[in-house]
């Protein structure tokens, strides 16, 4: 094994751990208390053992503090059992315990013998338990060191030629977040960076200032922490045995975990555990003292699916006491916000029972808040700001008339603002400045997308703490930094509760907030009355299709205890409501059911991988579409002929699948493997991307046991993946491995969920007698298997080498040179296929030929010219050349702000860069950039439009930066970001063409580097010049670079670039909003 093969993988470990050593070097540094050094390798050892210990890497955060003994106190199996039982009992994160579950024993029996395994061992524990090599390592290092390795270190085993897998320790994927994972990786070559015209000198000048500020901030944070955790407030911190902080070095980008070890704790209790890197506000999470402001977030997901009325509003809830329930008082609210959290209402009380003097002085103010809340006319304010229009006289109005009646985020903000003015006493704001700033944050929060969040640090930005006299114990005298820090923490807790508890709770009480199918991630706010009418009309339409049968109370009572009841909800579409059925719950029964659903999905995928014909013409995405079109496009370009296109969309595909046909199809899939044993492995993969930094992915994989007998343990599995070329320079962490599932188990569970599908809507319960739930993870595969079976029966004569049929779940596309085949396909599907529940939506049928019989029978059929750009699933296909373009008409009237979730994080600039790089990787797909399937003109046009949309995304991200950050404050960084994206785009274009395009900066190849760079300049100049004041410095550099590129490009290539960029602002981009 060459160390050079492992060097990139070891670089990942060194970027995350301060100490990384080979086990041999780790052992050489140990001196036992008996006076001699540890000897891991002896001359008589076999080469196999020497190779084994040299392939083990030990990573740790802090060196061993106590002097260990060399004594062998217990055997390796006993020590392993002790560690596993301890980890499970203390609920610590350790890879060694993955797959180890306690048996159903009483607590007394579990604690009786800690040296005995209380369950089956699999995965890492089984690998160590059954290894003679690990037993020899344990004997030579002694029990103390072996236990230290298992409990406090992260140990990785090398698998030649270039990968590692983790054996024990906190999972490596928990040691970094994607928000900061891109640090420490250079994206630009030196030559490219020198083109930034003085950018590096600007960065150097900024670095010294940042280093000084970072040092000051670290010192202040340490003082603040000491003050905040002093006295009575230290009580909760002492409950945690060890806490860890994440500290980042801005220059190297390494993450160091620093252990804090209370002196009163024993060594055995000082194992490293990770506190949450982020979480919710303390009043909701119950974490006191609260997390640092930059790690505490309010999420817009909290708005969703409310509409339960004011009775559920926090300030209207009652406190549980020994005498019963009573209304909350001022001191109760103080305890909820600053001490106990929402669990206080359920009777939870912590010390101190008597409020400290500072908080006791706040009681009158919070009592006034509650009095003003009880007098506040919420209904009148709601009707004033978000009035209902014609809802009482609607009667049996159409569903489409209610869909547009949602309240804009600005109207909701006006309502919330009126309520805050009426309820919150002026003294709590401190000043008009603070109140106006807070209102601005509330307005921003209400306008945010579904997955966005706001940190307490951002909420507190520019708030003047000293204006709030209610925070002070003494109104006069000197204010030390620690006191100011504590006041800031208290104000942060209050403002976080005011947003997450009061504002979010008020919105949930008065509105039903939901996503919509048309606006990606945008949140719609419906008044309760409107949503109730919408939901009622949608449900009537849904149940009229005969897909569900209502159960009587007696039938509901007779349901087996194992029955899982799903919930039905609706999501607004442009012209209707989409039913979504989901299983919601965190109890053991629900978790087991969801686990079985995932297992069924994995086993069906394994069957499909072994017999792809089961899926018929199914394509799962752009990669599959590219593979299909690559088989016919070259021949069409070489010898053009008329092609006939048919696009069909099934109406209600999931809900219309007949159960008898589904059972028949799945029986045919699983019957050949009824007695086959499946292995299901879930693992995490961590790797370093040269352009996007550290990345992680979580993968589930199912295989047949018989075909993978040589890949049972992780080392064998990793070796197999590398031999197949599927993996290199990666770290794997096994999470779950099971090998006890058979095909008959999957068939039995499928039959059970199909015949026993019970759905609850409101107070009524129904049994689904047709179709599959649209929200289930397995529904898409079931739908594709059913339609694949239909295609194999009905269309086997139509599909041949010259024709191709593709189907993305329920969207069909036929491309054929035979007009008769196209007409036959059209007639069959227009007539419907009742045995498969297939009914075509006539409004979504598109063809590029005249068929008078079909046109008469289907008046909504859309006929395009023989030669045109044919739309299908977000693509435009040239019917003559088979060139493929992206269809940007779907972005019309949509705001790009909702298609991106930048988030509030420590390094917003790095997060922005990671987001934009990730989007480039997804959008620069070979489907649009492959010269074998697309003409050069089409590729240039695709690149320009892709980059134009990317420039719009860049602008949206730049406007979303927190803390008043802007491009104007650091143009050097954002200019480098643009050049990094140029290089990455060029790399992706080369990757899509397997070397057909030269990646050098010389003028060779069909699409050269300078051409891509010029397209970047043109697209970014077009977008950013509309906001000249914001991007003045960037525009100057982009104009200079554009002129230089136009001079160095030849006439033909420059003409090709200008052809792609004409018109500069395409028609389909005019309706895109930012």
Curated annotation (Swiss-Prot):
Signal peptide span per the entry? none
Q: Where is this motif: TFLY?
A: 300-305
State the function annotated in the UniProt record: Telomerase is a ribonucleoprotein enzyme essential for the replication of chromosome termini in most eukaryotes. It elongates telomeres. It is a reverse transcriptase that adds simple sequence repeats to chromosome ends by copying a template sequence within the RNA component of the enzyme.
Supply the name of the protein.
Telomerase reverse transcriptase
Which keywords appear in this protein's UniProt record, sorted alphabetically? Chromosome, Magnesium, Metal-binding, Nucleotidyltransferase, Nucleus, Ribonucleoprotein, RNA-binding, RNA-directed DNA polymerase, Telomere, Transferase
List residues of the Reverse transcriptase domain: 552-877
Tissue expression profile of the protein: Detected at highest levels in gill, ovary and testis, and at lower levels in brain, eye, heart, skin, spleen and stomach.
What InterPro entries does the database record attribute to this sequence?
A: DNA/RNA_pol_sf, RT_dom, Telomerase_RBD, Telomerase_RT, TERT_C
**Which Gene Ontology BP annotations are present?**
DNA strand elongation; telomere maintenance via telomerase
The record's region (Disordered) falls at: 240-265
Catalysis performed (reactions): DNA(n) + a 2'-deoxyribonucleoside 5'-triphosphate = DNA(n+1) + diphosphate
Q: Where is this region: Interaction with RNA template?
A: 355-360, 461-486
Q: What is its main location?
A: nucleus
């Amino acid at each position: 094994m060459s160390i050079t093969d492992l060097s990139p993988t070891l670089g990942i470990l060194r970027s995350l751990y301060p100490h990384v050593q080979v086990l041999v070097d780790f052992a050489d540094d140990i001196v036992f208390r008996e006076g001699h050094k540890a000897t891991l390798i002896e001359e008589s050892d076999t080469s196999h053992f020497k190779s084994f210990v040299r392939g083990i890497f030990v990573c740790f955060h802090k060196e061993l503090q106590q002097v260990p003994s060399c004594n062998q106190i217990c055997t390796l199996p006993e020590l392993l059992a002790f560690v596993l039982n301890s980890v499970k009992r203390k609920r610590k994160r350790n890879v060694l315990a993955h797959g180890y579950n306690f048996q159903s024993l009483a607590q007394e029996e579990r604690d009786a013998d800690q040296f005995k395994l209380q369950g089956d061992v699999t995965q890492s524990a089984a690998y160590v338990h059954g290894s003679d090599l690990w037993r020899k390592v344990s004997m030579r290092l002694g029990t103390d060191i072996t236990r230290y390795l298992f409990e406090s270190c992260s140990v990785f085993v090398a698998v030649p030629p270039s990968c590692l897998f983790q054996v024990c320790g906190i999972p490596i994927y928990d040691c970094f977040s994607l928000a900061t994972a891109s640090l420490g990786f250079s994206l630009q070559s030196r030559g490219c960076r020198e083109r930034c015209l003085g950018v590096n000198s600007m960065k150097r000048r900024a670095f010294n200032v940042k280093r000084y500020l970072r040092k000051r901030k670290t010192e202040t944070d340490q003082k603040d922490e000491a003050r905040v955790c002093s006295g009575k407030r230290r009580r909760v911190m002492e409950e945690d045995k060890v806490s860890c902080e994440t500290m980042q070095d801005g220059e190297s980008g390494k993450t160091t975990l620093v252990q804090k070890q209370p002196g009163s704790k024993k060594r055995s209790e000082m194992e490293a555990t990770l506190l949450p890197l982020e979480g919710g506000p303390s009043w909701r999470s119950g974490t006191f003292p609260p997390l640092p402001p930059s790690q505490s977030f309010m999420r817009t997901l909290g708005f969703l699916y409310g509409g339960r009325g004011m009775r559920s509003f926090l300030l209207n809830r009652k406190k549980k006491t020994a005498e019963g329930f009573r209304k909350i008082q001022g001191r109760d609210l103080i305890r909820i916000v600053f001490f106990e959290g929402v669990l206080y209402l359920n009777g939870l009380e912590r010390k101190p029972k008597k409020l400290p003097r500072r908080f006791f002085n706040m009681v009158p103010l919070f009592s006034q808040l509650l009095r003003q809340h009880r007098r506040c006319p919420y209904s009148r304010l709601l009707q004033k700001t978000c009035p209902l229009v014609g809802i009482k006289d609607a009667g049996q109005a159409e569903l489409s008339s209610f869909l547009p009646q949602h309240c804009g985020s600005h109207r909701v903000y006006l309502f919330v603002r009126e309520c805050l003015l009426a309820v919150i006493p002026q003294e709590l704001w401190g000043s008009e400045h603070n109140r106006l700033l807070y209102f601005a944050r509330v307005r921003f929060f209400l306008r945010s997308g579904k997955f966005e969040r706001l940190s307490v640090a951002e909420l507190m930005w520019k708030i003047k703490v000293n204006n709030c006299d209610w925070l002070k114990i003494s109104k006069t005298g000197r204010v030390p930094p620690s006191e100011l820090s504590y006041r800031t923490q208290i104000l942060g807790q209050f403002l976080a509760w005011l947003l997450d508890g009061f504002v979010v709770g008020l919105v949930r009480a008065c509105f039903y907030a939901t996503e919509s199918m048309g606006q990606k991630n945008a949140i719609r706010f419906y008044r309760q009355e409107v949503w109730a009418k919408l939901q009622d009309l949608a449900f009537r339409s849904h149940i009229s299709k005969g897909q569900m049968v209502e159960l009587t109370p007696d039938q509901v009572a007779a349901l087996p205890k194992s029955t899982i009841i799903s919930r039905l909800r609706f999501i607004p579409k442009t012209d209707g409501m989409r039913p979504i059925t989901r299983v919601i719950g965190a109890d053991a029964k629900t978790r087991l059911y969801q686990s079985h659903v995932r297992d069924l999905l994995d086993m069906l995928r394994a069957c499909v991988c072994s017999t792809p014909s089961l899926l018929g013409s199914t394509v799962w995405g752009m990669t599959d579409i590219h593979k299909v079109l690559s088989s016919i496009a070259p021949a069409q370009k070489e010898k053009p002929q008329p092609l006939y296109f048919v696009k069909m969309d099934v109406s209600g595909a999931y809900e219309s699948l007949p159960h008898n046909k589904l059972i028949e199809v799945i029986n045919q899939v699983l019957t050949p493997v009824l007695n086959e044993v499946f292995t299901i492995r879930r693992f995490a993969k961590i790797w370093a991307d040269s352009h996007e930094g550290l990345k992680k992915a979580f993968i589930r994989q199912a295989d047949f046991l018989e075909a993978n007998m040589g890949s049972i343990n992780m080392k064998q599995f990793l070796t197999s993946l590398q031999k197949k070329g599927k993996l290199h320079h990666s770290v794997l962490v096994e999470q779950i491995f099971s090998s006890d599932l058979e095909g008959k188990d999957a068939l039995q569970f499928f039959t059970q969920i199909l015949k026993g599908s019970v759905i609850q809507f409101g107070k009524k319960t129904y049994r689904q007698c047709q179709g599959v739930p649209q929200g289930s993870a397995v529904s898409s595969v079931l739908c594709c298997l059913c339609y694949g079976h239909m295609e194999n029966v009905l269309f086997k004569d139509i599909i041949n080498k010259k024709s191709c049929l593709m189907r993305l779940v329920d969207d069909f596309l036929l491309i054929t040179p035979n007009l008769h085949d196209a007409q036959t396909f059209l007639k069959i599907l227009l007539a419907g296929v009742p045995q498969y529940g297939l009914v075509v939506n006539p409004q979504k049928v598109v063809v590029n030929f005249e068929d008078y019989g079909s046109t008469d029978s289907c008046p909504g059929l859309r006929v395009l010219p023989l030669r045109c750009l044919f739309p299908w699933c977000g693509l435009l296909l040239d019917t003559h050349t088979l060139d493929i373009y992206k269809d940007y008409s779907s972005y019309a009237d949509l705001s790009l702000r909702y298609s991106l979730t930048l988030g509030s994080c420590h390094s917003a600039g790095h997060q922005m860069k990671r987001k934009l790089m990730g989007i480039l990787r997804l959008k620069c797909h070979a489907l649009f950039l492959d010269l074998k399937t697309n003409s050069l003109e089409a590729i240039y046009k695709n690149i320009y439009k892709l980059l134009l949309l990317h420039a719009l995304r860049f602008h949206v991200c730049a406007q979303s930066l927190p803390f008043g950050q802007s491009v104007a404050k650091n143009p050097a960084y954002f200019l480098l970001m643009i050049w990094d994206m140029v290089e990455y785009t060029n790399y992706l274009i080369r990757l899509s063409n397997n070397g057909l395009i030269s990646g050098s900066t010389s003028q060779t190849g069909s699409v050269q580097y300078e051409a891509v760079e010029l397209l970047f300049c043109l697209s970014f100049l077009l977008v950013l010049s509309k906001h000249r004041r914001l991007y003045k410095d960037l525009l100057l550099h982009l104009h200079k670079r554009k002129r230089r590129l136009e001079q160095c490009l030849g006439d033909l290539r420059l003409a090709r670039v200008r052809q792609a960029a004409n018109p500069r602002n395409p028609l389909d981009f005019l309706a895109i909003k930012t």
